UniProtKB/Swiss-Prot annotation:
InterPro entries, per the entry: Ribo_uL30_ferredoxin-like_sf (IPR036919), Ribosomal_uL30_bac-type (IPR005996), Ribosomal_uL30_ferredoxin-like (IPR016082)
Protein name: Large ribosomal subunit protein uL30
The keyword Ribosomal protein belongs to this UniProt entry's keyword annotation: yes
Gene Ontology molecular function: structural constituent of ribosome
Lineage of the species this protein comes from: Bacteria, Pseudomonadati, Pseudomonadota, Alphaproteobacteria, Hyphomicrobiales
Keyword Disulfide bond: no
Pfam families linked: Ribosomal_L30
Family: Belongs to the universal ribosomal protein uL30 family.
Taxonomic source organism: Xanthobacter autotrophicus (strain ATCC BAA-1158 / Py2)
Biological processes, Gene Ontology terms: translation
Annotated NCBIfam families: rpmD_bact
Keyword tags: Ribonucleoprotein, Ribosomal protein
Subunit annotation: Part of the 50S ribosomal subunit.
């Protein structure tokens, strides 16, 4: 099994966003703008990134 990772950076604020989007950011390990988090590249993580795609950016 390969140990692929994905790094995401928060570029948007969760202020005035639905609670589930804020909770998704916390699940990704993000809480403030311009913070980065490195996670395992799994379908669950990819789904979370897709849910808040307007608030995060994938760093390659």
């Amino acid at each position: 099994m390969s140990d692929k990772t994905v790094t995401v950076e928060q570029i948007g604020s969760p202020i005035r966003r639905p609670f589930d989007q804020e909770a998704t950011l916390v699940g990704l390990g993000l809480n403030k703008r311009h913070r980065r988090s490195t996670l395992k590249d799994t379908p669950a993580v990819r789904g979370m990134i897709a849910k808040v795609a307007h608030l995060v950016r994938v760093v390659e």
